[in-house]
């Protein structure tokens, strides 16, 4: 079970640094935009769920200048950053809200879009049902989330460390949704013309501590393992970092894989 309060607080604290460290998230945003353009949609009303600092909303505003864009994010710090970035003309369209409980009327939007957000939910059902609820007939739902395979190097190294350190404890890494789970959740929510696929994005860091710091800087620290208490917990983390560097390190540093699941469906 994911503690949503911890997620909210982490992204609240990471809001100011997010854009400087979210390189993969920016590439994902551009990919989802290319999917929208390929769909040929011309929405009049757009909802951005988990809008973060407003980067996607700005790009959507450039592409659809006459569209009314509403942004929601669970974290107060992110919503505040989005208001600053979007400027006064869009300030009234930014709200603090939960993807699982949208404070919005039924059938309002032609497009609901989200990137790098839904992986922080325990299940996808409520958020997908809410997205469908606020969509108008024939409205489009397009999203990207980090799926199973994300941080596979970190997970493999951490599990190896748990097995090698006596009383190392349990696996504390975040569980990401599989592509099949995403597709099934869309079907349960009642979406039609569903398309789901995944792509890998690989980011390189100088070393493992630098990677872990970057993840924490963008508020996503809950995706990385948390050391248990005491000496054994410290040994697990030390062993994990050494194993990561030995198994996966190279001339470019250490890789961190993000498996991005993209989904599109119509109401």
Swiss-Prot record:
Keyword Transmembrane: no
The protein's name: Malonyl-[acyl-carrier protein] O-methyltransferase
Catalyzed reactions per annotation: malonyl-[ACP] + S-adenosyl-L-methionine = malonyl-[ACP] methyl ester + S-adenosyl-L-homocysteine
Highest taxon listed in the record's lineage: Bacteria
Entry-linked PANTHER family: ARGININE-HYDROXYLASE NDUFAF5, MITOCHONDRIAL
Gene coding for it: bioC
CDD domains for the chain: AdoMet_MTases
EC number: 2.1.1.197
Gene3D superfamilies with a match to the protein in the record: Vaccinia Virus protein VP39 (3.40.50.150)
InterPro entries: BioC, Malonyl-ACP_OMT, Methyltransf_11, SAM-dependent_MTases_sf
Enzyme class: transferase
Role played: Converts the free carboxyl group of a malonyl-thioester to its methyl ester by transfer of a methyl group from S-adenosyl-L-methionine (SAM). It allows to synthesize pimeloyl-ACP via the fatty acid synthetic pathway.
